[in-house]
Swiss-Prot record:
Gene3D superfamilies: 6.10.250.590. This is Pro-glucagon. The modification Arginine amide is found at R127. The record marks R52, H53, R83, N84, R91, H92, R97, H98, R130, D131, R145, H146 as: Cleavage. The modification Phosphoserine is found at S54, S105, S108, S150, S152. It comes from Sus scrofa. GO terms for cellular component: cytoplasm; extracellular space; plasma membrane.
Length: 180
């Protein structure tokens, strides 16, 4: 890709050089015609025409310079964006803002963490304690089956209840730290 940019830059410089040479050749041809001997050189109209010509030449040269400068700046910009894989110039890195989605995601994560801390604190204070069914009734529920011999959805419900009870007991008996 660097070679493409390099070739493009060379092409721009060659085209610019050929334009300058053709303009210089045209100016030299117009200067090579001798002025007629009968025209007075001190004529004010002639001086005004020469002045306008020199101003036009300066303006033309200046605009050519600005065009070449813009072309160089463009090629430099292309090369810089290629060097920076993320297409962000180094001077803009400091001012890069988070996207709204990223900000929303960060806030959501923070709020979820806060909610988890509050829930665990609520459980630790004892407000979350409930009376669970005895182990005997749970065993009886495990033995029930459908008529076809497969476990029912109640089995999943019972297992979920057991897991929830074990988790809450673990939370109540485990010392909570502020690392959450």
């Amino acid at each position: 890709m660097k070679t493409i940019y390099f070739v493009a830059g060379l092409f721009v410089m060659l085209v610019q050089g050929s334009w300058q040479r053709s303009l210089q050749n045209t100016e030299e041809k117009s200067r090579s015609f001798p002025a007629p001997q009968t025209d007075p050189l001190d004529d004010p109209d002639q001086m005004t025409e020469d002045k306008r010509h020199s101003q036009g030449t300066f303006t033309s040269d200046y605009s050519k310079y600005l065009d070449s400068r813009r072309a160089q700046d463009f090629v430099q910009w292309l090369m810089n964006t290629k060097r920076n894989k993320n297409n962000i110039a180094k001077r803009h890195d400091e001012f890069e803002r988070h996207a709204e989605g990223t900000f929303t995601s960060d806030v959501s994560s923070y709020l979820e963490g806060q909610a988890a801390k509050e829930f665990i604190a609520w459980l630790v204070k004892g407000r979350g304690r409930r009376d669970f069914p005895e182990e005997v009734t749970i065993v009886e529920e495990l033995r029930r089956r459908h008529a076809d011999g497969s476990f029912s959805d109640e089995m999943n419900t019972v297992l979920d209840n057991l897991a929830t009870r074990d988790f809450i007991n673990w939370l109540l008996h485990t010392k909570i730290t502020d690392s959450l």
